[in-house]
Amino acid sequence: MLKEFKEQRLNEIQELRSMGIEPYPYKFEKELTAREIREKYDYLQAGEVLESEKLSFAGRVMSIRHHGKTAFFHMKDDTGRIQAYVRADSVGKEKMDLFKRHVKIGDFIGVRGFPFKSKTGELTIYVQEYTLLSKALRPLPEKWHGIKDKEIIYRQRYLELIVSDEAIERFRKRFKAVQVIREFLNSRGFIEVETPILHYVTGGAEARPFVTHLNVFDIDMYLRIAPELYLKRLIIGGFEKIYEIGKNFRNEGISYKHSPEFTSIEIYQAYADYNDMMDLTEELIVEVVKRTCGTLKISYQGKEIDFTPPWKRVRMRDFLKEKLGVDILEDPDEVLLKKLEEYGVELEIKNRAHLIDKLRDLVEEELVNPTFIIDHPVVISPLAKRHREDPRLTERFELIIFGREIANAFSELNDPVDQYQRFLEQAKMREEGDEEAHMMDLDFVRALEYGMPPTGGLGIGLDRLFMFITDSPTIRDVIPFPIVKPQKFEEEEAEFEGGFEE
């Protein structure tokens, strides 16, 4: 079917060019969007014509209904859809015949005319001129059933965006949220900065990195798992309020909440601590939810999440003691391991840090509304400052929403001797087989030796946050082009043939 369809369209293109018509012209003067047309002329009554108002519009043809010497068709741009009406006694018989023969669903056209409302009350453009702007060689998914196979959606996101207004709105929300974040931070005196994607040493998170090779120096390098250590170098250098929005890469599994490539924001503020960063996190996310959703109580997968501040703050030690009956500071490893075994949790690595991490995972699922889990043990927080009241703990928090970690923040460790010792402990864990433990970063220790002011640091996983504001069940639904298992092109074409409802 696809082969025959493309051949037919290619023949049409050849026919157009033989008539002196270029099916892929260079530009068109589009004056209004679909939304602007609706907003400007929605006051018209059914059957009312406003011939004195001239407008131009361009978009993709999504449907056509031919009626003899006339046709109604719907066009779509990135703000929505608008109906248009063309007839022979307006554009001329030759152009009408050309429209019937060569303007097809999926093509882009530009129109000029005036607004009116049909007898049924639908705002419509009365076409006086039209220009073919781009011929589509492939058929669109059938309107009502759309795309059946989610893998097609993820591999060919452009298809979903073409046929689904909901998909356009989902990603518009995502992109608007990023804009809101920038406006929020810029208005508070933060500067957006850039740090390297290629790292000599991984750091800033516990994760398995992607390894690449730099030919010019004949050395292995790593795609960053987090920008943290470079951002703190900027704080050491003299910047005081900075943030970076960008991609991180972790060579780990894919799930509904994990992607090997993901977007995060990290924020650092000199002379602040983790209490200040908690306040900032709450204010920032409240602003994002309010401006993208219009309310602080949103529905996510059938459950309500209430973002109304103030958010609950719970000490990790107290939380795990209440829920599981274990004391992560006092109980020996054997007690923690036994509790995990009671829940059927299997561990490849059984050091204390992993035991505590897995215990935390058991109970975070029940936290639906935003909750700060605070004051983590030193053993699982190698970059956080020791707690001012209990040196076994750190001044760290994680923000949990709907059972998922959304943010992680510290009073940043700025004691170079303490940091060096913790890197040594992490290096020992790597030697024992923990590939996610931090590498030794002697240059970062050297930078700390020049002095870093008291600093609050914060990282937010933006994709997970965007899942909530778009009510998306999986992280791949909010990443425009997510990583999927590759297929041969021929297999994808076969999948295309069978992937649509007819």
UniProtKB/Swiss-Prot annotation:
Predominant location: cytoplasm
Pfam families according to UniProt: tRNA-synt_2, tRNA_anti-codon
An MF annotation (GO) of this entry: magnesium ion binding
Cofactor: Mg(2+)
Subcellular location field: Cytoplasm
Annotated Mg(2+) 1 binding sites: 398, 405
Gene Ontology BP, a term: lysyl-tRNA aminoacylation
A GO cellular component annotation in the UniProt record: cytosol
SUPFAM superfamilies: Class II aaRS and biotin synthetases, Nucleic acid-binding proteins
Keyword field: Aminoacyl-tRNA synthetase, ATP-binding, Cytoplasm, Ligase, Magnesium, Metal-binding, Nucleotide-binding, Protein biosynthesis
Ligand binding (Mg(2+) 2): 405
Free-text cofactor note: Binds 3 Mg(2+) ions per subunit.
EC number per UniProt: 6.1.1.6
Reactions the enzyme catalyzes: tRNA(Lys) + L-lysine + ATP = L-lysyl-tRNA(Lys) + AMP + diphosphate
Family note: Belongs to the class-II aminoacyl-tRNA synthetase family.
Subunit: Homodimer.
Protein name in UniProt: Lysine--tRNA ligase
Organism: Thermotoga petrophila (strain ATCC BAA-488 / DSM 13995 / JCM 10881 / RKU-1)
The gene coding this protein: lysS
